[in-house]
Curated annotation (Swiss-Prot):
Organism: Rattus norvegicus (Rat)
Glycosylation (residues): N66, N551
Signal peptide segment: 1-27
Species classification: Eukaryota, Metazoa, Chordata, Craniata, Vertebrata
Residue numbers binding 2-oxoglutarate: R602, Y659, N679, R732
Compartments, as annotated in UniProt: Rough endoplasmic reticulum; Endoplasmic reticulum lumen; Endoplasmic reticulum membrane; Secreted
Positions of the UniProt region annotated as Important for dimerization: 675-718
Required for glycosyltransferase activity: annotated span: 28-293
UniProt protein name: Multifunctional procollagen lysine hydroxylase and glycosyltransferase LH3
Length: 741
């Protein structure tokens, strides 16, 4: 392909045979008073066959600095070859050749030709023209470290003391007559190589001197990123960001993500020139934004839910779907469940989901679909339906606490967009800021700031997962292939993101709002009867929402919810009814209740002075989780109720006691081996049992009607001598901890 481009001596001969053009004067030759950097004499010419997001990004940067841009090729078929993988690009020269006929005789006209899909302008026309005139060239090409496409030509390049040695055709600037004189010689195929064409002209010493051709060796104007990523850093001003080349201490005007540096350009484009600034924040978050009108029905959405592994708190996730702030008659639900374990949870919620959404489809584990196949099926159902305007993919480990999430993402008006979600208190999130060479996770310089929302905006990232919205039209026109997730051996989300990136579609991430969080699923053990109980470490926020009483925080804040039925005996809400029920069910499922005898092999000494029928938390593997509950919730309440006392919340004895009239109905008077004791009622008096309660003998005071989920907190040894009152009917359960023994 490249061999059809003629030798440089033949090109020189052809150029010498051309009719003479009006002389082109350099800045130093111009009469005094002439303006060598008049922006009105500058035209930026670029090439684009389609209005991709990269092209729009280029135009946004041009508009920010008030450049005049002329685009060649819009709407036309690209015949220039697969330039991302091999040689080609000659079609650009053919288009430019035709366009330059208009400017052939305009001596003061300066043309800058650049690519568009992978280019960002970083400074003003005035700075650009000033630097060009200072170069003393009539035609200045960008430079890079690689002699592409023919390494055999490297020795013919002039030696360079400092800077990049080789020509890159992705950007050049020059006087119009000079550029016209060069491109006029193009008589080759569209898929011949444009860079080889320009290279062979430049390598002829006579031609180089005659036409004053040169390279931007130190990236004063053009910064090609390929081979130079270590040289480039962001330079933050208050209202503007640009890049700095630290190798040459220059501030390039044009940033070109040539070769395999498209993702790095996307990262830089999040900031340059005004994507995000320290003072102004996000500069284009509201660009092209749409507002869903209140009086009209919003777009139709396919909500695709994926339960691909055992997932904590799934019933709460399913109920949260009903709370989306979006008309349910405009949402169709697709739900793929890959876990037999979760079938009862989905069966319980399915009638509500059926009644709520306009249409529903359930694909269960019996279909034996892989995660990728299920995702392909769901996405294609939107793709094939012209009425499907948006596709909302949501994994079961994504906790959307903001009911307006769907509406917010649609109004952002991007082809693909995800809400930023992360695990509570951790840096694990649903996006990657960069990719490693093998396309796995790499941490971008701004990753922590984005996850912690120290920088808030709209970000172009290489990978998203677990929750995202895609335009239906984008699926139908730009992602028409059915197998997007299952097209390779990689993770389905990685395959999807690669497919989107390869199409030139940006993966946007918004952290402008608090959308929710991610669940950790790696330690979810479904061998337990109620595995959610064990999630206090991995998913503490969701655990609290499910298991800590809704009024606990108010009680801790002193809002009058703590009662004192007896001296120094405090009564406050601690656990939800669900936790009480699940604790009891776990104990009964385990079933190995002690016999209420003094001999007890579970204790170090083998003897219990005041025996009860009980099961220790250690026996069911819940000791660590219960101690964490004591540290997190009981400790702060204790220090609030007993000022001046600091608890270490150590507890060796943590157990559930069962009282029955025919088993052990009561407990004789005793002191507890603790500094203070926690006693939580786990079921309802009058419903589950009759009788019961606790009497403090020294004060002749009793708590005879314990409330389910409420905790009694009282001193243990010395002062609060107490007994368990008889249970006369049913079964009474309490949870007891002897704290700080």
């Amino acid at each position: 392909m490249a061999a059809s481009v003629p030798e440089p001596r033949l090109l020189l001969l052809l150029l010498l045979l051309l009719p003479p053009l009006p002389p082109v004067t350099s800045a130093s030759d111009r009469p005094r008073g002439a303006n060598p950097v008049n922006p009105d004499k500058l035209l930026v010419i670029t090439v684009a066959t389609a209005e991709t997001e990269g092209y729009r990004r280029f135009l946004q940067s041009a508009e920010f600095f008030n450049y005049t841009v002329r685009t060649l090729g819009l709407g036309q078929e690209w015949r220039g070859g697969d330039v991302a993988r091999t040689v080609g690009g000659g079609q650009k020269v053919r288009w430019l050749k035709k366009e330059m006929e208009k400017y052939a005789s305009q001596e003061d006209m300066i043309i800058m030709f650049v690519d568009s899909y992978d280019v960002i302008l970083a400074s003003s026309p005035t700075e650009l023209l000033k630097k060009f005139v200072q170069s003393g060239s009539h035609l200045l090409f960008s430079a890079e470290s690689f002699c592409w496409p023919d390494w055999g030509l490297a020795e013919q390049y002039p030696e360079v003391g400092v800077g990049k040695r080789f020509l890159n055709s992705g950007g050049f600037i020059g006087f119009a007559p000079t550029i016209h004189r060069i491109v006029r010689q193009w008589k080759y195929k569209d898929d011949d190589d444009d860079q080889l064409f320009y290279t062979q002209l430049y390598l002829d010493p006579g031609l180089r001197e005659k036409l004053k051709l040169s390279l931007d060796h130190k990236s004063r104007i053009f910064q090609n990123l390929n081979g130079a990523l270590d040289e480039v850093v962001l330079k933050f001003d208050q209202n503007r960001v640009r890049i700095r080349n630290v190798a040459y201490d220059t501030l390039p005007v044009v940033v070109h993500g040539n070769g395999p540096t498209k993702l790095q350009l996307n990262y830089l484009g999040n900031y340059v020139p005004n994507g995000w600034t320290p003072q102004g924040g996000c500069g284009f978050c509201n660009l092209n934004r749409r507002t869903l009108p209140g009086g009209q029905p919003p777009p139709r959405v396919l909500l695709a839910v994926f339960v691909e592994q055992p997932t904590p708190f799934l019933p709460r996730f399913l109920q949260r779907l009903l709370l989306l702030d979006y008309p349910p008659d405009r949402i169709s639900l697709f739900l793929h469940n890959n876990e037999v374990y979760h079938e009862p949870h989905i069966a319980d919620a399915w009638p509500q989901l059926q009644d709520h959404f306009s249409a529903v489809k359930l694909v269960g584990p019996e279909e034996a679909l892989s995660s990728g196949e299920a995702r392909d099926m769901a996405m294609d159902s939107c793709r094939q339906n012209p009425e499907c305007e948006f596709y909302f993919s949501l994994d079961a480990d994504a906790v959307l606490t903001n009911p307006e999430t769907l509406r917010i993402l649609i109004e952002q008006n991007r082809k693909v967009i995800a809400p930023m979600l992360s695990r509570h208190g951790k840096l694990w999130s649903n996006f990657w800021g960069a990719l490693s060479p093998d396309e796995y996770y790499a941490r971008s310089e701004d990753y922590v700031e984005l996850v912690q929302r120290k920088r808030v905006g709209l970000w172009n990232v290489p990978y998203i997962s677990q929750a995202y919205v895609i335009r239906g039209e984008t699926l139908r026109t730009e992602l028409p292939e059915k197998e997007v997730f299952s097209s390779s051996d990689t993770d389905p989300d990685m395959a999807f993101c690669r497919s989107v990136r390869d199409k030139g579609i940006f993966l946007h991430l918004s952290n402008q709002h608090e959308f929710g969080r991610l669940l950790s699923t790696s330690h979810y053990d479904t061998d337990h009867l109620h595995p959610d109980l064990w999630q206090i470490f991995d998913n503490p926020v969701d655990w609290r929402e499910q298991y800590i009483h809704e009024n606990y925080s108010r009680a801790l804040d002193g809002e009058g919810l703590v009662e004192q039925p007896c001296p120094d005996v405090y009564w406050f809400p601690l656990l939800t009814e669900q936790m009480c029920d699940e604790l009891v069910e776990e104990m009964e499922h385990y079933g190995q209740w002690s016999g209420g005898r003094h001999e007890d092999s579970r204790l170090a000494g083998g003897y219990e002075n005041v025996p009860t029928v009980d099961i220790h938390m250690k026996q069911v593997g819940y000791e660590d989780q219960w101690l964490q509950l004591l540290r997190t919730y009981v400790g702060p309440m204790t220090e609030h109720l007993f000022p001046g006392y600091h608890t270490k919340t150590r507890a060796v004895m943590n157990f559930v006691v069962r009282y029955r009239p025919d088993e052990q109905p009561s407990l004789r008077p005793h002191h507890d081996s603790s500094t203070f004791t926690l006693n939580v009622a786990l079921n309802h008096k009058g419903v589950d049992y009759e009788g019961g309660g606790c009497r403090f003998l020294r004060y002749d005071c009793r708590v005879s009607s314990p409330r389910k989920g409420w905790a009694l907190l009282h001193p243990g040894r010395l002062t609060h001598y107490h007994e368990g009152l008889p249970t006369t009917r049913g079964t009474r359960y309490i949870m007891v901890s002897f704290v700080d023994p």
